[in-house]
Amino acid sequence: MLLLWRRKTVGLICLFSILLTIYLYVSMYPEDNERVWNSGNADIQRKHEKLNNGGQGRHDFDDDEGAEKDEEDAVEKQNIAAPPLPKSFTTFPDRSKEIEIDTDLLGKINGKAEDDLQVEGYKKYQFNGLLSDRIGSRRKIKDSRNARCSSLTYSDSLPAASIVVCYFNESPSVLIRMVNSIFDRTKPEHLHEILLVDDSSEWSNATDEAIKYREKHIIQWEKVKFLKTDKNEGLIRAKIFGARRANGEVLVFLDSHCEVNEEWLPPLLDQIKQNRRRVVCPIIDIIDAITMKYVESPVCTGGVNWAMTFKWDYPHRSYFEDPMNYVNPLKSPTMAGGLFAIDKEYFFEIGSYDEGMDVWGAENVEISVRIWTCGGELLIMPCSRVGHIFRRQRPYGIKTDSMGKNSVRLARVWLDEYLENFFEARPNYRTFTDYGDLTSRISLRRNLQCKPFKWYLENIYPELLPDNTPNQLNNQILVAGKKYLIKMANGTHCLSAENSQGRIANGNRVEMRKCNHMERMQQWKYSSTNELRPMGSSRMCLDSLRGISVILCHNQGAHQMWQVSNAGKLYSRSVNKCATGSNDVSALSTLKFCSLANSFQFVEL
């Protein structure tokens, strides 16, 4: 009985304590006594959308309407006033080593003061500034590399890099954590210096706190140097400002809201050591602007549309049939622009950035085209990964249409006879004249003996070529049940199924052989389901899944369905490419974008 009485007494005391706590809390915040304070990330999302006034900023650069709207918003939006250092930064955890961080737990909001701090962070940075401050000076992130990356080796004598980081009105915690991620995941011999370039921010919080942090951690931060532009130059000219003051053999440009991953730098430096004309980029992983979680990105390459805006492209699924392609260098027609490495001397040899461009926008596409057409290479390294906070929109406004002006400069200098394609994509810039003097950039192109833009389209990015998809298909050229020689127009060679002693094996290639109407391997029967079957084996079909080959017929159409355009192009809709060939002895038939493919004559037998 005594034990039971004690348990009841303890229970009543606990209940009384809880009720007293609730009473005191409600008394302190009577105006909010019906509000739920323990909001998680769903509540954060709603606040973020509210702060953006329902606006949808761009994540991808291939949204033309979004690009134009972003430009208009940039012109109309005014710079926000300089606020004081967030109170959340006064408890910024300074850690000596990386630890696992539970961002879900840290993201909880308790009380009106924290709620106000969170709202303030979104207004200032367009990401969760409060959560960033709580995460602290360093954290452990997921190693997002493919497992094969850890077995790769690199040269023992790699060049040392100057890392150039430009920022404007940045969060102190994000900037400090980025620098620490570099020190924690970079070998000292690979790092010459880190240049933090303050592009005349409206408030000096990030620089001031980073300087204080360096004073406390002078041994580790010894290689950090602080630079400041005389006036706000914009990202493009701020990068040039930093590059001119760098002393390392290689320049590595990083955005200020990044965290580098394990062994991120050797894959970049190794390619430049092999060929100083190589410009190399990491895979850009995502740091979620709301949850601050580190999210792995797939392997992809940079592309562009006729509006000259950047977009991401994904390699064809057949590319990864070789598992090593998850780690091999990948040629990229363009780069996103914020994160890349380049030999310092080569950067200035090819003209650095176009200093006639303003602030940011299109400079990444311009330098990409220049690299490829003027003798360089642009690669993406899957074993180098850097996380980047993708914000919905910039946290500050600009008073000029920099994206539009810069795109016009790019188009008028580099597009040659394809300039009209740009104006068709962006007709509002056809009469735009305030793009500045182009004389020096045209002279640079001539002095570097750069190839024409047509070469870039045909050899680097044929996806952009006009007429890649046949506009008109002719259903009268091939008739079901008939047999044909498929002969190159104005040529002497025909499509011929590869065989061994007259037998065609599943997966055999298709060769270009001198035409012989008696040769059964050159006779192709067209079926009612648009298949082309070699008479040497009626069970096989011409297939486009892995290039041009002969595969067992599956009667499903898809890669075994062929049509002919009015121009005589043999077209596979499933891969949106056409068969092509040559008159070279024993050449193989391949797939190309239709604008680059040969025309054929279909000779009925």
UniProtKB/Swiss-Prot annotation:
It comes from the Eukaryota. The gene is gly-11. Pathway: Protein modification; protein glycosylation. Gene3D superfamilies: 2.80.10.50, Spore Coat Polysaccharide Biosynthesis Protein SpsA, Chain A. One of its GO terms (biological process) is protein O-linked glycosylation. The keyword Metal-binding applies. May catalyze the initial reaction in O-linked oligosaccharide biosynthesis, the transfer of an N-acetyl-D-galactosamine residue to a serine or threonine residue on the protein receptor. Residues 1-11 are cytoplasmic. Residues 329-391 are annotated as: Catalytic subdomain B. Its cofactor is Mn(2+). Substrate binds at residues 199, 256, 360, 391, 396. Residues 30-605 are lumenal. Belongs to the glycosyltransferase 2 family. GalNAc-T subfamily. Mn(2+) binds at residues 255, 257, 388. This is Putative polypeptide N-acetylgalactosaminyltransferase 11. One of its GO terms (molecular function) is polypeptide N-acetylgalactosaminyltransferase activity. It comes from Caenorhabditis elegans.
